[in-house]
Regions:
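N-terminal secretory/targeting leader peptides
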Residues: 1-179
Length: 179
């Protein structure tokens, strides 16, 4: 989700935008899309929007009320369908030896409440959390990029994907398989 002072309805609209990115990869992505990427922590977004240091940010809806983003920007751009600008990965991990050291009944509880079931329910919680941020911004402008425009953004973003795959390979991982 892009939140910006000026409307962003095409790839060309990204040019000249000073956009805050949450991670190194997303910051690289913003640069490939034509924006001037700016890295900064979340708490600095309101001040930097107010001062004109940035003109927008990439941020999930559920976070926006906590920094009063809807009061600082009036445009919100999202991609149509189930496409998103990027994906954040959350991992719940446990040391294997610790897991193996648990009694069978406790391992069974963990097995029953993790994996695909936990992933699906967590994804739904994240989707449901968007409603609060959307409601707060209800008087603002919402822009949804259509399929043809999304394809243009994907083509522009491909160098970021290629670099990620290369870096993964350099670390001994199959980046293509991960994607």
């Amino acid at each position: 989700m892009l939140h910006s002072k000026e409307p962003i309805s095409s790839l060309e609209d990204m040019v000249g935008q000073e956009m805050r990115g949450p991670t190194r990869v997303v910051t690289d992505l913003l640069g490939e899309l034509g924006a001037t990427p700016v890295g900064m922590p979340l708490p600095l977004i309101p001040e930097n929007l107010s001062k004109g240091v940035i003109s927008g940010t990439v941020l999930p809806w559920e976070v926006t009320p906590s920094i009063r983003l809807a009061e600082l920007v009036s445009n919100h751009t999202e991609l149509s369908g189930d496409t998103s600008l990027y994906t954040a990965v959350f991992i719940m991990a446990m040391n294997w030896d610790s897991y193996e050291g648990l009694p069978d009944d406790l391992r069974q509880i963990l097995d029953d409440h993790t994996g695909k079931g936990l992933a699906a329910s967590t994804a739904q919680v994240m989707l449901d959390a968007d409603a609060g941020g959307r409601n707060v911004a209800s008087g603002n402008t919402f822009i949804t990029l259509d399929g043809a425009e999304i394809e243009r953004w994907k083509a522009a973003a491909q160098p970021v994907v290629d670099r990620w795959v290369t870096r993964a390979g350099e670390m001994g991982f199959d980046g293509e398989a991960a994607i």
